[in-house]
From Swiss-Prot:
Residues bearing carbohydrate: 106
Residue intervals passing through the bilayer: 138-158
Subcellular location: Membrane
Predominant cellular place of this UniProt entry's protein: membrane
Role of this protein: Part of the gene cluster that mediates the biosynthesis of elsinochromes, pigments consisting of at least four interconvertible tautomers (A, B, C and D) that have a core phenolic quinone to which various side chains are attached and which play an important role in fungal pathogenesis. The non-reducing polyketide synthase PKS1 was proposed to iteratively catalyze decarboxylation between acetyl-CoA and malonyl-CoA subunits for polyketide chain elongation.
Protein name, entry field: Elsinochromes biosynthesis cluster protein HP3
Membrane topology per record: Single-pass membrane protein
Alphabetically ordered keywords of this record: Glycoprotein, Membrane, Transmembrane, Transmembrane helix
Transmembrane recorded as keyword: yes
InterPro entries xref list: Elsinochrome_Biosynth-Asso
Induction section of the entry: Expression is not affected in the presence of large amounts of glucose, during nitrogen starvation or at alkaline pH, conditions highly conducive to elsinochrome accumulation.
Lineage, highest ranks first: Eukaryota, Fungi, Dikarya, Ascomycota, Pezizomycotina
A cellular component term, taken from the record's GO annotations: membrane
Database matches in PANTHER family: INTEGRAL MEMBRANE PROTEIN
């Protein structure tokens, strides 16, 4: 199999074959958004020699098929050709072309421009970042306020710096919470801190929802689902805070 005289077979499965309008025997294999491989063949079932060209890609027909290529041992590398941007109006946009899935049958001496991975299953436009919805600052603001509220609550219960009216029999029996005499003073301080962080998260959630609905036509489904998740976190935080107010009242 490693002999240099052995032929090389490369198989493209479920590949978009772009048929050239000028010749029925010229095919283009798209490799990326700006590269392609041009093939010439008398039939799609026999031996197919490889040729490259810088001719602008103007295609009118797309074929889905399994395309097997046979190369001589002298071929050691297949290099995609960069195409020009003179694609005529009305042709399919570049971003819907699927990257070929390449399978080497009996040798690994050939390197195809398309990698042997799952890139061929990614259809549609590339996902662009949206810092207004899923930026580092937005996520950090949400997580920071949530963790600070949790740490303040745990510290208050562990140190007994809470109001006696907030301690239940379950807290005393299972968690052995002991309320100190000066707990009511620190309890008001901790409660105000929790209110500040909760208000911050609520305002941030409202701002994210406004930004999401303002750009609803341009954002991706993933960013919309991410914004809905952040809004759910803000809603749950607000409901927990209102429950605490009802208990205190």
């Amino acid at each position: 199999m490693s002999d240099s005289a052995s032929p090389i077979f490369v198989e493209y499965r479920n590949t978009d074959l772009l048929l050239s309008p000028s010749s029925a025997h010229v095919y283009y294999l798209p490799v990326s958004s700006d590269k392609h491989i041009m093939l010439t063949a008398s039939t799609t079932m026999g031996a197919v020699p490889l040729t490259t060209s810088t001719t602008p890609l103007v295609s009118s027909t797309v074929h889905q098929t399994v395309f097997r290529l046979r190369f001589d041992s002298a071929v050691t590398r297949l290099t995609p050709v960069t195409t020009t941007t003179s694609v005529t109006t009305g042709t399919l946009p570049w971003y819907i072309y699927q990257t070929p899935l390449v399978e080497i049958i009996n040798t690994t001496r050939v390197t195809i421009g398309a990698p042997y991975d799952c890139d061929g299953f990614f259809w549609g436009r590339e996902l662009r970042p949206n810092p207004d919805i899923s930026g580092v600052g937005v996520v950090f603001a949400f997580m920071l306020s949530a963790w600070l509220v949790w740490l303040i609550t745990v510290y208050a219960f562990a140190r007994g710096q809470i109001d006696a009216s907030q301690v239940t029999s379950a807290d005393t029996r299972f968690f052995r919470v002991q309320v100190k005499s000066s707990g009511w003073r620190w309890s008001s301080v901790f409660l105000r801190a929790i209110l500040v962080f909760s208000d911050q998260q609520l305002v941030t959630g409202i701002a994210i929802m406004i930004a999401t609905f303002a750009s609803c036509q341009d954002i991706s489904v993933w960013h919309y689902a991410f914004a809905v998740s952040l809004a759910w976190v803000s809603h749950q935080h607000y409901c927990s805070l209102k429950t605490q107010h009802c208990v205190l009242d």
